[in-house]
Amino acid sequence: MKYFDKIAKVYDSWYTTKTGSYVDKTEKELVLSLLKIKKGFSLDLGCGTGNYTLELHKKGFEVIGLDSSKEMLRVARKKVPEIFFINGDAYFLPFKDQVFNLVVSITMFEFIKEPTKVMKEIYRVLKPGGEVLIGTMNGRSLWFLFKRIKSLFVETAYRYARFYTPKELKNLCQKAGFKNIETRGIIFFPSFFPFTQLAFKLDRKLNRIFKNFGAFVVVRAEK
């Protein structure tokens, strides 16, 4: 997507803000807590600037990052030069069958037109017993509503995005043949909310009570 080539150099700047830092930390905590596989060969699908590629590398995984944006990959390679990054297509993954123990894809599915096709490719490249984690914006959250309205007036990535509910993500996994499917959601306040320490604490409490209603939803499944 050309839009991501255009914003690649400034993409990570949001994570340096107070809200961005909190969101990034909270989302990563959730994703990493859901991992049952602790080592092996992993693919960060739609890796962008390599944020999750780096996290998987730190956890001891052998990891490859794949993205369709050459400019995002240029940033990723500078950030983590020791990791192999590929400019590729999620619809036609350039790997043999049953290669990976783990596939992680964070905020990529919002921007693909044929999610069923991509899920089949993920299933194909995973080893038996391998797992997939997909993180997207939740289509039923306050955060989604704010992002969608904002994109009508200011060009953002979310103007081109499709948002999923936990049920839709489960259905995608089931159709592809995955089993042991679970979903979790986090981040309840929209991004314009003043994230004070009190708000952080309240948000974390809500995360524990309402596991599928946060702005960011993750589905985990096994082959």
State the predicted function of each range.
Residues 151-168:
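Acceptor-substrate binding/catalytic loop of class I
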